[in-house]
A protein has these predicted regions:
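Short, glycine-/Ser/Thr-/acidic-enriched flexible segments
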Residues: 19-21, 97, 146-147, 189-192
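Single conserved hydrophobic/aromatic residue that forms the stacking wall/gate
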Residues: 1-11
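Conserved catalytic/switch belt of AAA+ P-loop NTPases
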Residues: 112, 152-175
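P-loop NTPase catalytic core of nucleic-acid-dependent motor ATPases
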Residues: 8, 14, 20-136, 206-209
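AAA+/SF3 P-loop NTPase mechanochemical coupling elements
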Residues: 129-135, 167-187
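Conserved AAA+/SF3 P-loop NTPase catalytic/coupling segment centered on the Walker-B
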Residues: 138-161, 194-201
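A short helix-turn-beta junction within AAA+ P-loop NTPase domains corresponding to the substrate/partner-engaging
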Residues: 197-211
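Catalytic nucleotidyl-transfer cores of nucleotide-processing enzymes
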Residues: 16-18, 180-197
């Protein structure tokens, strides 16, 4: 996340532990003090590594459905590059031991602990301090969501890239609101149900079954 050059440049450069990767050219550049990053991926960039084992596993979880495999791969790329401009959240739905938690763990490992946040829908909607924890994160993860029938106003604001509160507990003075530049992932046994009467949530939801 290259804060000095605006959101568009986030998609072009990523900071690794061994240099700065130009996403378009795949060229690994040396560290540059003129580039100010707010996030770093916690591992080296190694172009010689292959992703075939992951692709093979994804094909297994999707019963060979290549289109869904490609969507899952594209989502991981979107998380890695902070493509919040798509204004979507992914909902991975399936029974236990179907691979949905493994996929969520893969996304978490891809960005690293410092760039991810784990929460619950109830906590996000009812705790006014929770949104502040999203600042400079790439991934907001809701694991194994049980039956939920409450408000999703904060979730809609986050995925719609609206300004959200930056209120921090035990800190006086107001902090500037910010836009969440990461993506949201939900894993559950069934699609979440909410009290939202509009189409705002439905058009942002991308449900992928893990059967």
């Amino acid at each position: 996340d290259c804060s000095s050059r605006g959101l568009g440049d986030v998609y072009k450069r990523q900071l690794f532990t061994n240099g700065i990767l130009n996403i378009n050219t795949k060229e690994l550049l040396p560290f540059d003090r003129e580039m100010h990053f707010t996030q770093q991926l916690p591992y080296d960039y190694k172009p010689e590594l292959e992703c075939e084992p992951i692709i093979k596993w994804l094909k297994k979880t999707q019963d060979g459905n290549w289109d869904r495999v490609q969507v899952l791969r594209a989502w991981l790329r979107a998380v890695l590059l902070s493509h919040s401009d798509i204004q979507k959240f992914v909902e991975i739905v399936g029974p236990g031991k179907s691979g949905k938690s493994t996929y969520a763990n893969l996304a978490h490992a891809l960005v690293g602990d410092d760039n991810a946040m784990i929460s619950s829908l109830e906590h996000l909607e009812k705790n006014r301090f929770e949104t502040a924890n999203l600042y400079k994160k790439k991934l907001l993860l809701f694991n194994d969501v049980e039956r939920y029938g409450g408000s999703v106003s904060v979730l809609k604001a986050i995925t719609g890239r609206d300004l959200i509160r930056n209120e921090r507990k035990f800190q006086s003075g107001s902090q500037k609101p910010f836009k969440f530049n990461g993506l949201v992932m939900i894993t559950a046994n069934e699609p979440i149900q909410t009290t939202d009467p509009t189409s705002g949530l439905a058009r942002r939801r991308l449900t992928i079954p893990f059967d």
